[in-house]
Regions:
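Short, structured protein-protein interaction patches enriched in aromatics and acidic/basic residues
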Residues: 24-42
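Short alpha-helical interface elements
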Residues: 20-22, 31, 62
Length: 124
């Protein structure tokens, strides 16, 4: 099996069935998902929102962390998606409360070798 096959399966299922369900403990809380899909030859970043999705080939360093990162730089998307995917779909309150942007930046810095892993992660 390949990353392309996994990508096709996930996007087909999201388009057909949607995703999610209540993941809150005491109240309703829903969020969308992102995936890093890889095999020995290639890798993809897939971000989703409801039944919508956008994907691009992964660069040398990629991270996901409870926030959308694809702007208009995706290579393929579900029907009806155009422009800035993040701007159209990101829940800014959830992203801020979760500290997602800081955590994503810290994990990217660690993977890029831009600092001491423990110090960077403690700042996130």
């Amino acid at each position: 099996r390949s990353a392309k096959e996994a990508l096709k399966l996930i996007t087909t299922m999201i388009g057909e069935y949607g995703q999610g369900g209540n993941c809150g403990f005491h109240k309703a809380f829903y969020y969308d998902n992102a995936f890093l899909i890889a095999d020995e030859n290639e890798a993809y970043v897939l971000e989703t929102a409801g039944r919508s999705w956008a994907v691009k080939k992964a660069g040398e360093v990629e991270t996901i962390s409870n926030c959308l990162g694809l702007r208009a730089d995706y290579e393929a998307a579900s029907a009806g998606v155009s422009g800035d995917f993040r701007r159209a779909h990101q829940n800014h309150l959830v992203t801020a409360v979760a500290g997602a942007e800081k955590r994503r930046a810290a994990s990217r810095a660690v993977l890029s070798g831009e600092g001491e892993p423990f110090e960077l992660m403690m700042k996130a």
